[in-house]
A protein has these predicted regions:
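Bacterial N-terminal signal peptides that target proteins for export
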Residues: 1-10
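Compositionally biased low-complexity segments, especially N-terminal hydrophobic helices
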Residues: 9-14, 27-30
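Residue-level signal for mature regions of secreted extracellular proteins and peptides
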Residues: 14-15, 267
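C-terminal motif of bacterial Sec signal peptides marking the signal peptidase cleavage site
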Residues: 17-20
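Bacterial signal peptide processing site
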Residues: 22-25
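Glycan-processing catalytic domains of CAZymes
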Residues: 29-275
Length: 275
Protein backbone atom coordinates (compact mmCIF):
# COMPACT_ATOMS: atom_id res chain seq x y z
CA UNK A 1 0.00 0.00 0.00
CA UNK A 2 2.99 2.29 -0.24
CA UNK A 3 1.42 4.27 -3.09
CA UNK A 4 -1.62 5.35 -1.09
CA UNK A 5 0.66 7.64 0.89
CA UNK A 6 1.01 9.87 -2.09
CA UNK A 7 -2.66 10.72 -2.41
CA UNK A 8 -2.77 11.92 1.18
CA UNK A 9 -0.37 14.66 0.16
CA UNK A 10 -3.28 16.23 -1.67
CA UNK A 11 -4.51 17.24 1.77
CA UNK A 12 -1.40 17.53 3.90
CA UNK A 13 0.83 19.27 1.37
CA UNK A 14 -1.54 21.36 -0.78
CA UNK A 15 1.23 23.72 -1.79
CA UNK A 16 2.65 20.95 -3.92
CA UNK A 17 -0.31 21.35 -6.24
CA UNK A 18 0.65 24.94 -6.89
CA UNK A 19 4.16 24.05 -7.94
CA UNK A 20 5.20 23.87 -11.55
CA UNK A 21 4.02 20.57 -12.97
CA UNK A 22 6.47 19.99 -15.78
CA UNK A 23 8.68 16.96 -16.11
CA UNK A 24 11.61 19.13 -15.15
CA UNK A 25 15.18 19.20 -16.40
CA UNK A 26 15.93 15.88 -14.71
CA UNK A 27 13.59 14.00 -17.06
CA UNK A 28 15.91 12.73 -19.76
CA UNK A 29 12.92 11.79 -21.90
CA UNK A 30 14.48 8.70 -23.41
CA UNK A 31 11.18 6.86 -23.55
CA UNK A 32 9.72 8.26 -26.75
CA UNK A 33 6.17 7.14 -27.56
CA UNK A 34 6.06 4.56 -30.29
CA UNK A 35 3.59 2.84 -32.54
CA UNK A 36 1.89 0.03 -30.67
CA UNK A 37 0.89 -3.15 -32.54
CA UNK A 38 -2.72 -3.31 -33.59
CA UNK A 39 -4.88 -5.38 -31.24
CA UNK A 40 -7.11 -8.10 -32.62
CA UNK A 41 -10.80 -8.04 -31.64
CA UNK A 42 -11.09 -9.13 -28.01
CA UNK A 43 -7.37 -8.74 -27.41
CA UNK A 44 -6.19 -6.46 -24.62
CA UNK A 45 -3.01 -4.45 -24.32
CA UNK A 46 0.01 -6.31 -22.94
CA UNK A 47 3.01 -4.10 -22.05
CA UNK A 48 6.30 -5.98 -22.50
CA UNK A 49 9.23 -5.81 -20.07
CA UNK A 50 11.25 -2.62 -20.27
CA UNK A 51 8.38 -0.40 -21.44
CA UNK A 52 8.95 3.18 -20.29
CA UNK A 53 6.32 4.94 -18.19
CA UNK A 54 5.23 8.09 -16.40
CA UNK A 55 3.34 8.02 -13.10
CA UNK A 56 1.48 11.16 -12.06
CA UNK A 57 -1.30 11.22 -9.45
CA UNK A 58 -1.16 14.84 -8.23
CA UNK A 59 -1.00 18.30 -9.74
CA UNK A 60 -2.02 19.50 -13.18
CA UNK A 61 -1.49 16.69 -15.65
CA UNK A 62 1.58 17.25 -17.80
CA UNK A 63 0.99 15.52 -21.13
CA UNK A 64 4.36 16.59 -22.56
CA UNK A 65 6.43 13.99 -20.70
CA UNK A 66 8.08 11.70 -23.23
CA UNK A 67 6.88 8.31 -22.05
CA UNK A 68 4.91 5.67 -23.95
CA UNK A 69 2.75 4.82 -20.91
CA UNK A 70 0.98 7.20 -18.52
CA UNK A 71 -0.38 5.96 -15.18
CA UNK A 72 -2.74 8.67 -13.91
CA UNK A 73 -5.58 9.18 -11.42
CA UNK A 74 -8.80 7.65 -12.71
CA UNK A 75 -11.14 10.14 -11.06
CA UNK A 76 -9.22 13.34 -11.70
CA UNK A 77 -8.17 12.64 -15.28
CA UNK A 78 -10.80 13.58 -17.85
CA UNK A 79 -11.90 11.71 -20.94
CA UNK A 80 -10.49 14.56 -23.00
CA UNK A 81 -7.07 14.27 -21.36
CA UNK A 82 -7.01 10.54 -22.00
CA UNK A 83 -7.87 11.22 -25.65
CA UNK A 84 -4.99 13.70 -25.95
CA UNK A 85 -2.56 11.12 -24.60
CA UNK A 86 -3.85 8.36 -26.85
CA UNK A 87 -3.73 10.60 -29.92
CA UNK A 88 -0.04 11.13 -29.16
CA UNK A 89 0.52 7.37 -29.13
CA UNK A 90 0.50 6.86 -25.37
CA UNK A 91 -1.13 4.00 -23.51
CA UNK A 92 -3.04 5.02 -20.39
CA UNK A 93 -3.47 3.36 -17.00
CA UNK A 94 -6.33 4.29 -14.66
CA UNK A 95 -5.24 4.51 -11.00
CA UNK A 96 -7.92 3.41 -8.50
CA UNK A 97 -7.87 2.38 -4.86
CA UNK A 98 -9.68 -0.96 -4.73
CA UNK A 99 -8.65 -2.18 -1.29
CA UNK A 100 -9.16 0.97 0.77
CA UNK A 101 -11.90 3.58 1.07
CA UNK A 102 -11.02 7.23 0.51
CA UNK A 103 -13.26 9.95 1.89
CA UNK A 104 -12.30 12.42 -0.84
CA UNK A 105 -13.70 10.36 -3.73
CA UNK A 106 -17.06 11.35 -5.26
CA UNK A 107 -18.53 7.89 -4.60
CA UNK A 108 -17.37 7.70 -0.96
CA UNK A 109 -20.91 7.80 0.45
CA UNK A 110 -21.91 4.74 -1.57
CA UNK A 111 -19.79 2.50 0.66
CA UNK A 112 -21.68 1.08 3.69
CA UNK A 113 -20.05 1.97 6.98
CA UNK A 114 -19.66 -1.65 8.03
CA UNK A 115 -17.40 -2.24 5.02
CA UNK A 116 -14.89 0.23 6.41
CA UNK A 117 -12.15 -0.98 8.72
CA UNK A 118 -9.22 0.64 10.44
CA UNK A 119 -7.29 3.50 8.93
CA UNK A 120 -4.41 2.56 6.69
CA UNK A 121 -2.19 5.26 8.15
CA UNK A 122 -3.42 8.17 6.07
CA UNK A 123 -6.11 10.66 6.90
CA UNK A 124 -9.44 9.81 5.33
CA UNK A 125 -8.44 6.30 4.21
CA UNK A 126 -9.69 3.04 5.71
CA UNK A 127 -9.23 -0.56 4.74
CA UNK A 128 -12.16 -2.34 3.10
CA UNK A 129 -13.56 -5.69 4.17
CA UNK A 130 -12.60 -7.48 0.98
CA UNK A 131 -14.45 -10.61 2.08
CA UNK A 132 -17.70 -8.80 1.27
CA UNK A 133 -17.41 -9.26 -2.47
CA UNK A 134 -21.18 -9.22 -3.06
CA UNK A 135 -21.25 -5.60 -1.89
CA UNK A 136 -17.87 -4.49 -3.17
CA UNK A 137 -18.14 -5.90 -6.69
CA UNK A 138 -20.87 -3.50 -7.92
CA UNK A 139 -19.08 -0.54 -6.34
CA UNK A 140 -15.82 -1.43 -8.03
CA UNK A 141 -17.58 -2.30 -11.27
CA UNK A 142 -18.84 1.29 -11.50
CA UNK A 143 -15.30 2.57 -11.08
CA UNK A 144 -14.01 0.24 -13.77
CA UNK A 145 -16.86 1.34 -16.03
CA UNK A 146 -15.64 4.91 -15.51
CA UNK A 147 -12.13 3.93 -16.57
CA UNK A 148 -13.42 2.22 -19.68
CA UNK A 149 -15.73 5.09 -20.60
CA UNK A 150 -12.84 7.54 -20.33
CA UNK A 151 -10.87 5.42 -22.78
CA UNK A 152 -8.19 3.97 -20.51
CA UNK A 153 -6.24 0.95 -21.69
CA UNK A 154 -5.56 -0.51 -18.26
CA UNK A 155 -6.15 -0.19 -14.51
CA UNK A 156 -3.74 0.11 -11.58
CA UNK A 157 -5.70 -1.10 -8.52
CA UNK A 158 -4.09 0.03 -5.26
CA UNK A 159 -4.14 -1.33 -1.69
CA UNK A 160 -4.17 -4.94 -2.84
CA UNK A 161 -2.49 -6.36 0.26
CA UNK A 162 -4.87 -5.59 3.12
CA UNK A 163 -4.47 -9.09 4.53
CA UNK A 164 -0.89 -8.20 5.49
CA UNK A 165 -1.97 -5.11 7.41
CA UNK A 166 -3.97 -4.31 10.53
CA UNK A 167 -7.21 -3.79 8.64
CA UNK A 168 -9.72 -4.33 11.43
CA UNK A 169 -10.90 -7.53 9.75
CA UNK A 170 -9.56 -11.11 10.01
CA UNK A 171 -8.46 -11.16 6.38
CA UNK A 172 -6.57 -14.18 5.10
CA UNK A 173 -4.29 -14.78 2.14
CA UNK A 174 -7.14 -16.73 0.55
CA UNK A 175 -9.45 -13.73 0.96
CA UNK A 176 -6.89 -11.54 -0.78
CA UNK A 177 -6.38 -13.96 -3.66
CA UNK A 178 -10.11 -14.18 -4.24
CA UNK A 179 -10.55 -10.42 -4.20
CA UNK A 180 -7.52 -9.67 -6.35
CA UNK A 181 -8.71 -12.14 -8.96
CA UNK A 182 -12.12 -10.47 -8.91
CA UNK A 183 -10.45 -7.11 -9.54
CA UNK A 184 -8.52 -8.60 -12.47
CA UNK A 185 -11.73 -10.03 -13.91
CA UNK A 186 -13.51 -6.67 -13.67
CA UNK A 187 -10.79 -5.14 -15.81
CA UNK A 188 -10.59 -7.98 -18.29
CA UNK A 189 -14.36 -8.14 -18.74
CA UNK A 190 -14.16 -4.52 -19.91
CA UNK A 191 -11.29 -5.12 -22.30
CA UNK A 192 -8.69 -3.44 -20.10
CA UNK A 193 -5.37 -4.76 -18.87
CA UNK A 194 -4.70 -4.75 -15.12
CA UNK A 195 -1.61 -4.54 -12.94
CA UNK A 196 -0.79 -6.23 -9.65
CA UNK A 197 0.24 -3.54 -7.17
CA UNK A 198 2.95 -4.65 -4.74
CA UNK A 199 1.55 -7.82 -2.99
CA UNK A 200 4.85 -9.58 -3.59
CA UNK A 201 4.00 -12.69 -1.58
CA UNK A 202 1.18 -13.63 -3.94
CA UNK A 203 2.97 -13.05 -7.24
CA UNK A 204 3.43 -16.80 -7.89
CA UNK A 205 -0.33 -17.34 -7.61
CA UNK A 206 -1.41 -14.16 -9.42
CA UNK A 207 1.07 -13.63 -12.24
CA UNK A 208 -1.26 -15.49 -14.60
CA UNK A 209 -4.22 -13.28 -13.68
CA UNK A 210 -2.51 -9.91 -14.18
CA UNK A 211 -1.00 -8.28 -17.26
CA UNK A 212 1.78 -6.28 -15.59
CA UNK A 213 3.03 -5.33 -12.14
CA UNK A 214 3.41 -1.98 -10.40
CA UNK A 215 5.97 -1.84 -7.63
CA UNK A 216 7.33 0.76 -5.26
CA UNK A 217 10.77 0.64 -3.71
CA UNK A 218 11.77 -2.93 -4.49
CA UNK A 219 15.37 -1.76 -4.87
CA UNK A 220 15.37 0.03 -1.51
CA UNK A 221 14.01 -3.07 0.22
CA UNK A 222 16.02 -5.58 -1.87
CA UNK A 223 12.87 -7.22 -3.23
CA UNK A 224 13.16 -6.80 -7.01
CA UNK A 225 14.05 -10.43 -7.64
CA UNK A 226 10.58 -11.39 -6.41
CA UNK A 227 9.09 -9.67 -9.46
CA UNK A 228 10.94 -11.96 -11.87
CA UNK A 229 7.86 -14.12 -12.62
CA UNK A 230 6.28 -11.18 -14.43
CA UNK A 231 9.38 -10.55 -16.53
CA UNK A 232 9.68 -14.26 -17.32
CA UNK A 233 6.05 -14.22 -18.48
CA UNK A 234 6.80 -11.33 -20.85
CA UNK A 235 4.94 -8.79 -18.70
CA UNK A 236 6.20 -5.34 -17.74
CA UNK A 237 7.10 -4.38 -14.18
CA UNK A 238 6.52 -0.64 -13.72
CA UNK A 239 8.83 0.26 -10.85
CA UNK A 240 9.43 3.49 -8.93
CA UNK A 241 11.94 4.47 -6.27
CA UNK A 242 11.59 7.53 -4.02
CA UNK A 243 14.60 7.60 -1.73
CA UNK A 244 17.29 6.10 -3.98
CA UNK A 245 18.99 8.01 -6.77
CA UNK A 246 19.04 6.42 -10.21
CA UNK A 247 22.73 5.64 -9.79
CA UNK A 248 21.80 3.24 -7.01
CA UNK A 249 19.25 1.13 -8.88
CA UNK A 250 19.32 1.65 -12.64
CA UNK A 251 22.12 -0.79 -13.50
CA UNK A 252 20.37 -3.65 -11.74
CA UNK A 253 16.96 -2.53 -13.00
CA UNK A 254 18.06 -2.59 -16.61
CA UNK A 255 19.65 -6.01 -16.16
CA UNK A 256 16.38 -7.28 -14.69
CA UNK A 257 14.34 -5.59 -17.49
CA UNK A 258 12.34 -3.50 -15.02
CA UNK A 259 10.67 -0.27 -16.15
CA UNK A 260 12.29 1.88 -13.48
CA UNK A 261 12.02 5.58 -12.67
CA UNK A 262 12.76 7.83 -9.73
CA UNK A 263 9.79 9.80 -8.39
CA UNK A 264 8.98 12.15 -5.53
CA UNK A 265 6.57 10.91 -2.88
CA UNK A 266 3.83 13.29 -4.00
CA UNK A 267 3.84 11.70 -7.48
CA UNK A 268 3.61 14.97 -9.36
CA UNK A 269 4.87 15.22 -12.94
CA UNK A 270 8.58 15.18 -12.05
CA UNK A 271 10.48 12.00 -12.75
CA UNK A 272 14.00 10.88 -13.47
CA UNK A 273 14.55 8.03 -15.91
CA UNK A 274 17.43 5.59 -16.01
CA UNK A 275 20.22 6.82 -18.32
Amino acid sequence: MRASRTLRLLLVLPLLLLAACTAGPDDEGDDEPHRWPELAPGQRWQPPPGTGWQWQLTGKLDTSVKAPVYDVDGFNTTKEQVAVLKKAGRKTICYLSTGAWEDFRPDAEAFPQDLLGKGNGWEGERWLDIRRVAELEPLMAKRFDMCREKGFDAVEPDNMDGYQNTSGFPLTAADQLRYNRLIAKLAHDRGMAVGLKNDLDQIPQLVGDFDFAVNEQCAQYDECDRLAPFIEAGKAVFHAEYELSTSRFCVKSRAAKLSSIQKRYDLDAWRRTCP
